[in-house]
Amino acid sequence: MASMKIGLIDVDGHNFPNLALMRISAYHKANGDEVEWWWSDLVHYDIVYMSKIFSDAYTKDVPEPINADKVIKGGTGYCITLGADGKEHFDKSKNLSLPEDVERCFPDYSIYPQFNFAVSMTSRGCPRGCSFCHVAAKEGRCAVKVANVSDFWNGQKEIRILDPNITACKEKRDLMRQYKETGAILDFTQGLDIRLLNDDDIADINEMRLRTLHFAWDNPKDDLETKFRNFANGFRRKSNIGMVYCLTNFDSTMEENLYRIYTLRDMGYKPYVMVYDKPHAPKEIKQLQRWCNNKIIFNSCKRFEDYIQ
C-alpha cells in the first residue's frame, strides 16, 4: 500500500502539546506515512486532521483545507455549543474518539519540539458532573485508570498530568506510586480534588517533586474551608501551598467570590479567578479577575473594594 501524506492542524494554536495529534502522528509514521503540519492548500494531502479542545468562546475554528481527500475534525471544542441561556452544552453525539490502535500509540513528541516535557492522561472521567464542565458528559462519572505512566513518559524531566480527577480514581495509589517513581517534576494541570484528598494522598504528594499544585473551589455553596485547611496543615510547604481556581460569573455573587478569595489567601493559597463566558461577563467580574490574578496588584492592594475605588 502506498504511503499517504498526512496534515495536522492544532486549531487552538501551539501553546500546549495536543495529545490526540501526537498519537495520530505516531500512528501514521509507524505505518510509513509522511506527517507534517498543514500549511497550504497548494499542497495535496490524503488526510488532514483538525483538533480543537476549546469552545468558540476561546478558540475560533479555522477554515477546512480544500486540497485534501479527507478532513477529520475532532476534539471537545467541536462538541460544544452555546445555548440561549448563555451556558455551554456538550453534544456527545458529535464526540469522535480515537480508534483503539491510535489511542495506544506512544505520543510523537517530535511534532512539538518547543516543549521538553511529557504529557500524560492515565485516568479519565469525574464523578462530580459540574454543570460548567464537560468531562462527565464526555468521559463518564466514574474516574477509571486507562493507562500507565510509561505509556507517555520516556525520561523527560517534567510531566504535565491531564487526568481530570485522578483523586477520584480507585487505582490512584498505583498511579501516584508510578508518578513518584519517575523522579520527574510533576504538574497536575487539571487540579487535585480537595474534597477527596486523604492522609495517604497527602503523604504521596509530600514525596513528589512538584510544580505549583492546582485546586479548585468552583461552587461557593460548597464549604471547603476545612478541607483546604487540613491539606495546608499536612503539606510540607507552609507558604505558596498551591493555586486555587475560583469560578466566577456562574451562579455566584460578588460576596461569595470575595469570601473564597480572602479565605484562601489567608491560608497560604494563591486564588486565581476564572471567568465563565468572559466575553459577556460584567465589568466588575473582569476587574475582579484583573485584581486577583495580577499578583503584584493583589499583594499590594489587599481588598478588592479598595482596588475599584
Q: How does the language model describe each region?
A:
Residues 1-73, 78-80:
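A short, structured N-terminal alpha-helical element that caps or precedes a catalytic domain
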Residues 1-3, 40-46, 65-67, 113, ...:
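Flexible, charged surface loops at secondary-structure boundaries
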Residues 8, 13, 49-53, 134-231, ...:
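Core AdoMet radical
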Residues 18, 46-48, 60, 80-96, ...:
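Short, charged, surface-exposed secondary-structure boundary motifs
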Residues 19-20, 112-151:
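Canonical Radical SAM [4Fe-4S] cluster-binding loop centered on the CxxxCxxC motif
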Residues 66-74, 184, 238-240, 269:
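A short helix->loop->beta-strand "cap" motif at the edges of active sites that frequently abuts
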Residues 69-107:
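Ser/Thr/Gly-rich flexible loops in soluble cytosolic domains mediating phosphotransfer, phosphorylation
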Residues 207, 212-214, 221-309:
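A structural motif corresponding to the C-terminal lobe/cap of the Radical SAM core domain
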